[in-house]
Swiss-Prot record:
Modified residues (Phosphoserine): 217, 364, 367
InterPro entries reported for this sequence: TPR-like_helical_dom_sf, TPR_rpt, ZC3H7A/B, Znf_C2H2_sf, Znf_CCCH, Znf_CCCH_sf
Keywords, in A-Z order: Host-virus interaction, Metal-binding, Nucleus, Phosphoprotein, Repeat, TPR repeat, Zinc, Zinc-finger
Identification of the protein by name: Zinc finger CCCH domain-containing protein 7B
Name of the gene: ZC3H7B
Assembly, per entry: (Microbial infection) Interacts (via LD motif) with rotavirus A NSP3 (via the coiled-coil region).
Organism annotation: Homo sapiens (Human)
Zinc finger motifs (C3H1-type), residue ranges: 484-508, 616-638, 754-782, 886-914
Length: 977
């Protein structure tokens, strides 16, 4: 109960400091001290439970609140800040972040140079970083202070061996000296005091004593877990109830030991008068509305399936928002109608502007009878001698006005400012002609609309007709930008109709792009609850829409930095497959959704909690959420839908995995039936490919040589003797037009075939393809014909195509070429067995690739393609309206003088305020991406060269005097996070 109360106090306290409610300076200082002490104590409990990640969150929150207090001229005791740094260093060290642990240890020593624990943490961190000489110096000081501590002794011996020093035997003083109390003022007593000052026996433990001498600050209260600190302050954050009274002061009996005298007693009595007397003349409103909108349980306005238990997005940031947010830039959110709307950029984390609907939505949760313009409503005459509850407890809270539940905050619509959307059906939006785009909207038609068609139009477009937005094509592995259909551009009829995977108009491109990024869900545009009905969401439907599988992975490995993929082994399923750690798999497993296409994507599905919000985190979508598991929002659409599924069905994670296995067993059965009928040749396409073909060595082909394998099919016949494997060979086809060999790549997707294969626009123009991934457009007419032949005959493997050609042209020589039995068949539908090889190793979520060893991982994170992924994404082309920043973040001098800029798009300065604002926003996004990549250890710690992106990461002060040669000069500059 005591810990639950402390958690509630922390939650309320964090919400209170994010508001702008007034408070006396003395009470405010004591309130901040109590909040930091609670965070310190909660972090200690989590550390003892070995939940180091959450303990780190509490310590960081406590230090963040301390920084916020310092910015408000409130100084907290240095002893408490020192212990926070020491314990946070312990968390960092346990998690393997030795640089961070060293930094915190040095900060703690800056606050208290005599802190032995801080010195010990520093020594251990230096030891792990390979700085053994410095570590030995720190360890020696610890050994002199605590010569009998096992942890100190062990560390000293380890460092001595590494430095090649001789470990001498320690001197023991005669025991008779202690027996006859001859060491009353000697070192023995001092050692005992230091070793057990916090109630623990080893210096390797964390600091736990958070009691602070009240003489260090005139407005500080002693830390006692049983005495509530300013209940009238914390109660401002809870719904008012007429039955609530001020807690009694029975817990003061704890001070009956008579140890409080002098100034301590005066300070204690002053603080008690504050608690008992309430806020005399303070800013406590007589009728204060709730700061957090809460739906009454069981309201009939919500669907009966979900009831009133779905939490609503709060206008206040979550409890741990200060973890990644500057305290001086906190967003003050309240239901008081005197608030002005926030500016376009509130903080680097709030780069997505708040829409007007988010602020207006607060008005529907009840009206306020007073405002900041009426200071009299905030004054309440109270008698400091009366033990009566505050005025808010005497009067019942005003009942909220009857209104519809405000679910506007659940609607994630990033296109609200530029697009309009409407629902329709076949009756009000019928097809009026034979062509693909012949539809007309009948406005004002009286009928019962099914609302199963999404219509949209651009607000700024001259064409204000409603256009149908088809469902996004998901049966394709294409990951590039969407393009308009060539037939629709030429105002011709598209022969593929609704099956065309190209967009029919710009509105369709915009919606599809946002849907793929995860920032828009058409099901939530008009129904925030997503039309949740019993049976509408099933695991089979989720897997059919999102592909992939659900499985369990080791959560400790998955959350580690860098991310490690491991699951239970067959030999010992109770232990994870990470041989270096061998975590208990049953106690640390987590549900993960895995999709394997051109890359690997792992989406962690957290266990649904009541305080979670049914919305996708905007930070995760844009550059990765730094709060990770402590975030209250979903980090993917698949996680959001699983939460909805759990909300109404009560399914557990084990049930989800079992349903996933059943679904794939059914798919395997269907795939087996389909494969049995693939033996006969198809009647709708040619049975063989007429062009001459052969396999050659891929490495030799890149050097311009056509080299076939040897007779044993183990090596190529060149002098280099390259290994002959499926991955290192290339299929060549003789071009009749060019009369030379042309390489043919494997099918870009073996799961979903497009209607037709088109030539790559770069290859058509005789240029090299600029696409980073596996381009799904053919790079030659021969490649297009080969892919079309394979699609029509349901041939999924290049080897199978070659075997069919070889059988026709060399029927009497079946032994020539690569034998049919050596091919590795591929299945049209990926089964769970296809994921067996991706269940272990390091994982890079930026590139979607796994590495099997540390060496391979280091090579990957140092590659240029990987660094490019840190700063780019598939949505960059459609997410920005202006040029890429050219080097200088200021307006062009020529344009400011009204002259034309001769450099045009090559000008290094911005051509307008809007372009400059976008450049500044883009720089902040890139900084956040870099911070996320560094936090996840996707970059080498000392890697500070990012090529053309270096000038974007300079500080504002450096940019003010930037010269036109800034990008070149910045090639060796250190990036700033």
């Amino acid at each position: 109960m005591e810990r639950q109360k402390r958690k509630a106090d922390i939650e309320k306290g964090l919400q209170f400091i994010q508001s702008t409610l007034p408070l006396k300076q003395e009470e405010y200082e004591a309130f901040l001290l109590k909040l930091v002490q609670n965070l310190f104590a909660e972090g200690n409990d989590l550390f003892r439970e070995k939940d180091y990640k959450q303990a780190l969150v509490q310590y960081m929150e406590g230090l963040n609140v301390a920084d916020y207090a310092a910015s408000d001229q409130v100084a907290l005791p240095r002893e408490l800040l020192c212990k926070l740094h020491v314990n946070r260093a312990a968390c960092y060290f346990t998690m393997g972040l030795y640089e961070k642990a060293l930094e915190d240890s040095e900060k703690a020593l800056g606050l208290d140079s005599e802190s032995i624990r801080a010195l010990f943490r520093k020594a251990r961190a230096l030891n792990e970083l390979g700085r053994h000489k410095e570590a030995y110096e720190c360890s020696s000081r610890c050994s002199l202070a605590l010569p009998h501590d096992e942890s100190v002794t062990q560390l000293g011996q380890e460092l001595a061996q590494k430095l090649g020093l001789r470990v001498r035997k320690a001197y023991k003083r005669p025991q008779e000296l202690e027996t006859f109390s001859l060491l009353s003022n000697g070192t023995a007593a001092g050692v005992a005091d230091q070793g057990t000052s916090n109630g623990l026996g080893s210096i390797d433990d964390i600091e736990t004593d958070c009691y602070v001498d009240p003489r260090g600050s005139p407005a500080l209260l002693p830390s006692t877990p049983t005495m509530p600190l300013f209940p009238h302050v914390l109660d401002l954050l809870a719904p008012l109830d007429s039955s609530r009274t001020l807690p009694s002061t029975d817990s003061l009996d704890d001070f009956s030991d008579g140890d409080v005298f002098g100034p301590e007693l005066d300070t204690l009595l002053d603080s008690l008068s504050l608690v008992q007397g309430g806020l005399s003349g303070s800013g406590v409103p007589s009728e204060l509305p709730q700061l957090i909108p809460v739906f009454p349980g069981g309201t009939p306005l919500l669907p009966p399936v979900v009831g009133g238990s779905i939490p609503v997005s709060s206008p206040l940031p979550p409890a741990s928002f200060g973890l990644v947010m500057d305290p001086s830039k906190k967003l003050a959110a309240s239901v008081l109608d005197a608030l002005d709307p926030p500016g376009p950029t509130l903080d680097p984390l709030d780069l997505l502007p708040y829409s007007e609907t988010r602020l207006d939505a607060l008005d529907s949760f009840g009206s306020t009878r007073g405002s900041l313009d009426k200071p009299d409503s905030f004054m309440e005459e109270t008698n400091s001698q009366d033990h009566r509850p505050p005025s808010g407890a005497q009067k019942p809270a005003p009942s909220p006005e009857p209104c519809m539940p405000n679910t506007a905050l659940l609607i994630k619509n990033p296109l609200a400012a530029t697009h309009e959307f409407k629902q329709a059906c076949q009756l009000c939006y019928p097809k009026t002609g034979p062509r693909a785009g012949d539809y007309t909207y009948r406005e004002g038609l009286e009928h019962k609309c099914k609302r199963d068609i999404l219509l949209g139009r651009l607000r700024s477009s001259e064409d204000q007709t409603w256009k149908r937005i088809r469902p996004r094509p998901t049966k394709t592995s294409f990951v590039g930008s969407y393009y308009l259909c060539k037939d629709m551009i030429n105002k011709q009829d598209c022969k593929y109709g609704d099956n065309c995977t190209f967009a029919y108009h710009q509105e369709e491109i915009d919606v599809w792009t946002e849907e793929r990024k995860g920032t828009l869900n058409r099901d939530l545009l008009f129904d925030p609850l997503g039309g949740v009905k019993r049976g509408s969401l099933t695991i089979a439907k989720l897997l059919k829409e999102h592909q992939g599988i659900f499985t369990f992975l080791c959560e400790i490995c998955f959350d580690s930095k860098p991310r490690i993929i491991s699951k239970g082994t067959k030999d010992s399923p109770s232990v994870c497959s990470n041989l270096a750690a061998k975590h208990s798999f049953y106690n640390n497993k987590c549900l993960v959704h895995i999709v394997r296409s051109t890359s690997l994507k792992y989406s962690k599905i957290r266990q649904f909690q009541e305080h979670f919000q049914f919305d996708v985190c905007r930070h995760e979508v844009r550059y990765g959420c730094l709060r990770e598991d402590s975030c209250h929002f979903a980090h993917s659409f698949i996680e959001l839908k699983v939460w909805l599924l759990q909300q109404y069905s009560g399914m557990t994670h084990e049930d989800i995995v079992q349903e996933s296995k059943k679904y794939w067993q059914q798919m395997e059965a269907h795939a087996g039936k389909a494969s049995s009928s693939m033996g006969a040749p198809r009647t709708h396409g040619p049975s063989t490919f007429d062009l001459q073909m052969k396999f050659v060595c891929g490495q030799c082909w890149r050097n311009g040589q056509v080299v076939e394998p040897d007779k044993d099919l183990k090596y190529c016949s060149a002098k280099a003797r390259h290994c002959w494997t499926k991955e290192r060979r290339v299929l060549l086809v003789m071009s009749k037009a060019k009369r030379k060999w042309v390489s043919v790549r494997p099918l870009p997707s073996i799961r979903n075939f497009p209607q037709q294969y088109d030539l790559c626009i770069h290859a058509q123009n005789g240029r090299k393809c600029q696409y980073v991934g596996n381009c799904s457009f053919a790079h030659s007419p021969e490649e297009r014909d080969m892919w079309t032949f394979m699609k029509e005959n349901k041939i999924l493997d290049m080897q199978q195509t070659y075997d069919m050609w070889l059988k026709k042209h060399n029927p009497g020589k079946p032994g020539e070429g690569t034998p049919i039995s050596s091919r590795e068949g591929e299945k049209q539908i990926q089964m769970p067995t296809d994921y067996a090889d991706i269940m272990m190793g390091y994982h890079c979520w930026l590139c979607g690739k796994n590495s099997n060893s540390k060496k391979q991982w280091q090579q990957h994170i140092q590659s240029e393609k990987h660094k490019e992924k840190v700063f780019t994404s598939d949505s960059d082309a459609s997410g920005w309206a202006f040029r890429f920043p050219m080097g200088e973040f200021r307006l062009c001098d020529r344009l400011q003088k009204g002259k034309a800029c001769p450099d045009g798009d090559k000008c290094r300065c911005a051509h307008g305020q809007e372009e400059l604002n976008e450049w500044l926003d883009r720089r902040e996004v890139l900084k956040q991406k870099l911070a996320k990549a560094r936090k996840d250890m996707l970059l080498c710690p000392r890697d500070d060269d990012f090529g053309k992106y270096n000038f974007l990461l300079q500080e504002d002060g450096d940019l003010a005097g930037a010269t036109p040669e800034a990008p070149a000069a910045a090639a060796t500059a250190t990036t700033g996070e």
